[in-house]
């Protein structure tokens, strides 16, 4: 914003990536929540504004600046052969994100409480990528869950709690940005991590073979 203002351009920002901005949620002592459950209790009954519909028309400039073809960026190159596998499951864009939400609320949401933890069941919302990319907002998900909650859908409250888990993570990042590069608790600095990248244990971890086989 400062850079744009210096150029004589007005910049405005509007919240939408989170349900509640981190600085609007405080403990009684004026601090931030370091544990999830008290945060959930503090926000579960807060009003979440109903999202506005998309504008019918967005005026464009008389001329557009030169640009590049997105395909030329080779964004999937780093994934190598995995890109083709992921492409079969990705649903990109706001319209498909809304379809995914509708499918979830009319289906798997009813058994979400247990179904989301069972790998053999199609029990999750699959909305993580859409939320991360801004193709759907947490407010849209919240109100869809609220509508199902009003209908007596038993999984709706669990889904709202999961949305607040996402909020909790972002709130911690806002208040303690050092956790991106350092341990949450200094005592963990002495944890005996393995430094041998060629060890059998590290190889097993990279290939998802550290747990119990199904």
Descriptions of predicted regions:
Residues 18-32:
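Short alpha-helix plus adjacent loop in nuclease-associated cores
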Residues 1:
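Acidic beta-strand-to-loop metal/phosphate-binding motif
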């Amino acid at each position: 914003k400062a850079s744009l203002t210096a150029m004589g351009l007005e910049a405005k920002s509007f919240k939408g990536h989170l349900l509640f901005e981190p600085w609007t949620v405080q403990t009684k002592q004026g601090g931030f929540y370091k544990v999830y459950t008290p945060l959930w209790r503090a926000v579960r009954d807060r009003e979440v504004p109903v999202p506005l519909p998309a504008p019918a028309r967005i005026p464009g400039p008389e001329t557009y600046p030169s640009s590049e073809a997105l395909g030329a960026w080779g964004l999937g190159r780093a994934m190598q052969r995995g890109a083709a596998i992921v492409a079969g499951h990705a649903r990109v864009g706001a319209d498909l994100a809304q379809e995914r939400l509708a499918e979830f609320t009319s289906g798997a949401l009813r058994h979400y409480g247990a179904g989301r933890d069972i790998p053999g069941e199609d029990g999750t919302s699959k909305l993580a990528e859409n939320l991360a990319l801004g193709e759907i907002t947490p407010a849209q998900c919240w109100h869809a869950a609220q509508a199902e909650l009003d209908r007596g859908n038993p999984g709706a409250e669990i889904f709202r709690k999961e949305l607040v888990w996402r909020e909790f993570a972002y709130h911690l990042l806002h208040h303690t940005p050092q956790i991106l590069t350092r341990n949450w608790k200094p005592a963990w600095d002495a944890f005996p991590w393995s430094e041998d990248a060629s060890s059998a244990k590290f190889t097993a971890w990279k290939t998802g073979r550290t747990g119990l086989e199904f």
